């Protein structure tokens, strides 16, 4: 596929976070961009104002004429879209050039030095942090991110001069196997997406294969203690990192008064008194990985220090919506048991003497079936759990798999209930809340503005 010959790009599933970064990229190249998504969202409406044509009905008559010339149109789809989708079927039957999102991302980034962040969790924050460190340094970067950077209000960063592209490397559907990393961080390999992989062993094998793709001369930055076996090519340097040990790590950690300061230790330098712009304990580890990437890419110690202090975070990643003396409300994308445990522990560290209420919307029937006991254990670290129905995304219901499975396995004595997401607001009006955490990768976050308004009126302070 020669991208130069493409005049229009059509996206089936335009509202996904990864798809939207590609939409913005092709708009920046002056292409005609159109697409379909199932529902309107703040993101799709933003894309329309930026120049994309997006509709919400599955109807081939709504495909713009410019996108019906198969010689000059590229069709991009996400695996979340059913194979029988009418528009996808139209393009397939008429011989259009059709590629998965991950394939297109691999093609676009092949000619640059890819700085990739892979792993079960932590990759969105780590990659966005690394992109910020480089973008505000003399090195610069292009970046395709899996979340909206609060510093830039977008998930795409551009540079006319930098050789580097920061990429969130997604293991879902083995998407990251299309990439050609120059350097890669691997944050975690807790099994996930077992609907795709089947077994833990197959999941770990997928990460092993991914490490073979790192280019000679580059580097692998591997979290200490992972089960996976790396298999890098000759000429690839392997480093380790973690919060407290490894080639890259933090020392002299100071947490207090809503602030975190650390010293960053690398094999050939030490940067003292770094302030975390988003002072959450998990960002110590994320920050070490991001700083390792930036350091190995040529950012100076002072640029790294300034960038860490000015980092503002990612939408829906430990995202404070409301914070005063009477009420704290934050939203977090955590949707895997290990992520939820980290999230709740980080909240507990900040608010040790307050009651922590978690509202969790489970994401996918298969993930709930595979991990319901682990979800219950992680959620039980809070004081109160409110469960909503499962968000299905791409899946059909599985008999017997509901939020009740998690509910029944929560620790004895914990306050708990199950409710429809539509009833969350009325439930919160009746409850006394001190720290509220909304967790999940589904659509419950769409209620965040209404929850924020309700809580600020109820606990104005």
List where the protein language model places each region.
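Phosphate-binding loop of NTP-binding sites
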Residues: 25-31, 62-68, 79-224, 228-237, ...
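Hydrophobic Val/Ile/Leu positions in short beta-strands of Rossmann-like dinucleotide-binding domains
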Residues: 11, 77, 117-119, 438
């Amino acid at each position: 596929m020669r991208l130069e010959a493409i005049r229009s790009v059509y996206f089936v599933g335009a509202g996904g976070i990864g798809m939207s970064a590609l939409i913005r990229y092709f708009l920046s190249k002056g292409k005609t961009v159109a697409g379909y998504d199932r529902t309107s969202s703040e993101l799709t409406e933003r894309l329309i104002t930026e120049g994309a044509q997006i509709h919400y009905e599955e109807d081939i008559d709504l495909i713009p004429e410019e996108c019906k010339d198969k010689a000059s149109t590229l069709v991009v789809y996400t695996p979340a879209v059913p194979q029988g989708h009418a528009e996808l079927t139209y393009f397939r039957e008429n011989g259009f050039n059709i590629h998965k999102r991950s394939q297109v991302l691999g093609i676009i980034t092949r000619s640059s030095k890819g700085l990739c962040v892979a792993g079960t969790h932590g990759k969105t924050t780590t990659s966005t942090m690394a992109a910020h460190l480089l973008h505000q340094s003399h090195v610069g970067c292009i970046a395709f991110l899996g979340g909206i950077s609060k510093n830039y209000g977008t998930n795409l960063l551009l540079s006319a001069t930098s050789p580097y592209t920061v990429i969130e490397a997604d293991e879902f559907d083995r998407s990251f196997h299309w990439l050609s990393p120059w350097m890669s961080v691997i944050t975690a390999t807790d099994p996930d997406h077992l609907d795709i992989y089947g077994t833990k062993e197959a999941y770990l094998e997928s990460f092993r294969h991914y490490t073979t793709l790192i280019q000679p001369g580059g580097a692998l930055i591997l979290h200490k203690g992972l089960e996976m076996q790396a298999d890098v090519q000759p000429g690839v340097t392997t480093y380790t990192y973690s919060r407290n040990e490894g080639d890259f790590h933090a020392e002299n950690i100071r947490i207090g008064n809503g602030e975190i300061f650390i010293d960053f230790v690398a094999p050939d330098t030490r940067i003292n008194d770094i302030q975390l712009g988003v002072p959450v304990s998990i960002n110590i580890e994320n920050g070490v990985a991001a700083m390792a990437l930036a350091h190995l890419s040529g950012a100076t110690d002072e640029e790294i220090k300034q960038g860490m202090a000015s980092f503002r975070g990612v939408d829906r990643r430990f995202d404070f919506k409301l914070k005063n003396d009477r009420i704290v409300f934050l939203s977090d994308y955590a949707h895997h048991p290990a992520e939820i445990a980290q999230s709740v522990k980080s909240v507990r560290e900040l608010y040790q003497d307050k009651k922590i209420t978690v509202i969790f919307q489970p994401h996918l029937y298969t993930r709930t079936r595979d991990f319901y006991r682990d979800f219950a254990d992680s959620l039980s670290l809070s004081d109160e759990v409110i469960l909503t129905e499962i968000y299905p995304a791409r899946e059909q219901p599985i008999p017997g798999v509901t939020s009740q499975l998690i509910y029944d396995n929560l620790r004895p004595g914990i306050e708990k209930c199950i409710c429809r997401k539509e009833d969350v607001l009325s439930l919160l009006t009746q409850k006394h809340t001190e720290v509220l955490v909304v967790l999940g990768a589904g659509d419950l976050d769409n209620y965040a503005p209404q929850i924020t308004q309700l809580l600020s009126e109820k606990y104005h302070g």
